[in-house]
Amino acid sequence: MSTTIIGFPRLGEFRELKFTTEKYFRHEISAEELLAAAKELRAKHWNIVKEKGISEIPSNDFSHYDNVLDAAFLFNVVPSSVQGLELTDLERYFALARGYQGEKGDVRALPMKKWFNTNYHYIVPKFEKETQVKLAGHKIFDEFAEAKELGLVTRPVVVGPFTLLQVSDFEDGVAPADFVDALVVAYQEVFAKLAELGAERIQLDEPSLVKDLSAEEKALFLDLYKKLLADKKGLEVLVQTYFGDVRDIYADLVQLPVDAIGLDFVEGKKTLELVKGGFPADKTLYAGIVNGKNIWRNNYEKSLAVLEQIPAENIVLTSSCSLLHVPFTTANEEFEPAILNHFAFAVEKLDEIRDLDAIRNGGGAEALAANKELFATERVGENAELRARIAGLTDADYTRLPVFAEREEIQHKTLNLPPLPTTTIGSFPQTKEVRAKRLAFRKGELSQEDYDKFLAEQIDEWIKWQEEVGFDVLVHGEFERNDMVEYFGQNLSGYLFSKNGWVQSYGMRGVKPPIIWGDVTRLNPITVKWSSYAQSRTDKPVKGMLTGPVTILNWSFPREDISIKDSTLQIALAIKDEVLDLEAAGVKIIQIDEAALREKLPLRRSDWYEDYLDWAIPAFRLVHSTVAPDTQIHTHMCYSEFTDIIPAIDNMDADVISFEASRSNLEILDELKAKNFQTEVGPGVYDIHSPRVPNEGEIDHTIEAILAKVPSKKVWINPDCGLKTRGIPETKASLVRLVEAAKAARQHLK
């Protein structure tokens, strides 16, 4: 038996890649300096994996932005609008991810979507009629050669052709099958070149195999792989899956002439059952036994019990998915040993994989004994009062009265807003000064009084600016908040916060998910102080801004000793208390963000309701079920696909929902119309994830497109997400255009 991992975090132990890349974006360093820093980081990471005793080390799991974008770039899947720009390869690569606005042209970024059921986001490639699939990049070869210079023969990793097609968009008139032959040729060229460089095995990531597969999709996969594997160019091929089991394709997959198959024994409900039914003796099984998504220590006895049931002769122990979904290392944390011992970040998971391998081979007695002792000790007690409150919930606690249609009429009269009301999603740019003041306050270098004065000044400035520009519903800007989940978690019992537990979310953006350690209750009012203050500074309505229970759960590292449903209900009651306090303080519009609602949606449709939506949607309703009819409840969602769960979203019974739509060309609106969606909607009219400012007329055209599909009385005008990470000049310029476009559109309604 040997050991490996599917992939390793990219940003660095202290987010070195993020800070270096952002310097490049600000033109403070050259492309050569960026590439040199990245090379140094890769060497450091390979060395860590090697020193931990992992026998197979992956390469090309590193990315300057996103691994799906890397694959698209490698195979020349680049839209003609970007191909035509006179840019360097690196500039073109970043133009796909971030858009480009300069003397050489003006192009929007490609869309961004959630990577399966994680909080990682990938850039969505687009296959056009003009797309000429061919081997065009060299990153995968460069990184293999780099590692070889360090004495390491790595296993190169690339997104497999089936998943590349499944996660991409296609221009009208072309389909995935049109690109099969060209992709086969291009991938085989990669095989040949890697074999020439001295590679022995390539990892083709095919997580799309764990989803429900139609007969057409299965046929596409088999057509691709039969052609691809007809000539492997002397390279061994590992088809690596993760995030679930491959029940729909297993029988065909094991018959293909692949050399190895990677299966997920953590999230794959049926994986063990499938392999117990038979696994070919001539293939190697890469067994994903250590959870790549959560930060809790592996229970060695449970993992060993699973491994003992696997009939395969050749097994490589690995992570259940890439370790990019967990923080780098616990070494920089300051928790008490009694707490820290329960956590394993990426580096520690290398130890776990190595330990399990050693125990399987007759060693590791000390590691096994320590692990048994850890799991034999009670970790945390229960909150009896909270458990009783949950046990006492009835159907009435999940139902808001009167019904939506009656509330809508009441709210229109009470709020008296113009048609196409304008607002933003919540946060305004957090400048260096804002972050520095927060840090100084946290360190005790700034008094509470001085910090409060600074925050009040920020709120005053932006409330005044919103009034001057002409916004109808204002926000206070969230200057007191570091992260939309961490800020709430810091005011809830049962939460722990890492010092350096950063995880890549999209591009160079990292998030630091809090850890749910025990039962969750609200310690004190969280947002009332600043929401009330902001409302006191204006006669216009100011939205109270909360993060919803499902998003707080999904953007935290959840407990594994109770169900995520039970954890979510605990959080829902805490947020419910906050909603009622905001209402009592005179806040008439309360936004409860559920940005991550879709994130934990099972990958198989048959599991959607029973395993998730049947409790996630009621948990949201529990939060707002007892507010008055004239209190308007908003929610917001971003980065996701919703067209297939629209009835469930309507069932959240919010009064208004805003969502990311600009990058996806407002496709969701057709489905809203088809499904007779009742909730008022604010489709994002411009993309905030790119620094470009919408052109004059751009937002006008977007509003026109929205009004062609949604009745004007149901439409709100807003950006597609919060503005925390954007710069002030681009933010103000974009928002002025948004308000001007909304006012112009109102004239056409009359």
UniProtKB/Swiss-Prot annotation:
Which GO terms of type biological process are on file? Answer: methionine biosynthetic process; methylation
Q: Which domain of life is it from?
A: Bacteria
Listed binding positions for L-homocysteine are 425-427, 478, 593
Residues of the active site: 689
Pfam families given for it?
Meth_synt_1 (PF08267), Meth_synt_2 (PF01717)
Residues annotated as binding Zn(2+): 636, 638, 660, 721
Q: Per the record's keyword annotation, is Zinc included, yes or no?
A: yes
**EC numbers:** 2.1.1.14
Q: Which UniProt keywords apply?
A: Amino-acid biosynthesis, Metal-binding, Methionine biosynthesis, Methyltransferase, Repeat, Transferase, Zinc
Biological or metabolic pathway of the protein: Amino-acid biosynthesis; L-methionine biosynthesis via de novo pathway; L-methionine from L-homocysteine (MetE route): step 1/1
- Amino acids binding L-methionine: 425-427, 478, 593
Q: Which cofactor does it need?
A: Zn(2+)
* Reactions mediated catalytically: 5-methyltetrahydropteroyltri-L-glutamate + L-homocysteine = tetrahydropteroyltri-L-glutamate + L-methionine
Q: Name one GO molecular function term.
A: 5-methyltetrahydropteroyltriglutamate-homocysteine S-methyltransferase activity
Residues recorded as binding 5-methyltetrahydropteroyltri-L-glutamate, renumbered to this chain, are 15-18, 114, 555, 599
Cofactor notes: Binds 1 zinc ion per subunit.
Query: What's this protein's function?
Result: Catalyzes the transfer of a methyl group from 5-methyltetrahydrofolate to homocysteine resulting in methionine formation.
The record ties this protein, via HAMAP family, to: Meth_synth (MF_00172)
User: Member of which family?
Assistant: Belongs to the vitamin-B12 independent methionine synthase family.
**Protein name, entry field:** 5-methyltetrahydropteroyltriglutamate--homocysteine methyltransferase
Q: To which species is this protein native?
A: Streptococcus sanguinis (strain SK36)
What taxonomic lineage is listed for the species of origin?
Bacteria, Bacillati, Bacillota, Bacilli, Lactobacillales
Tell me the gene name.
Answer: metE
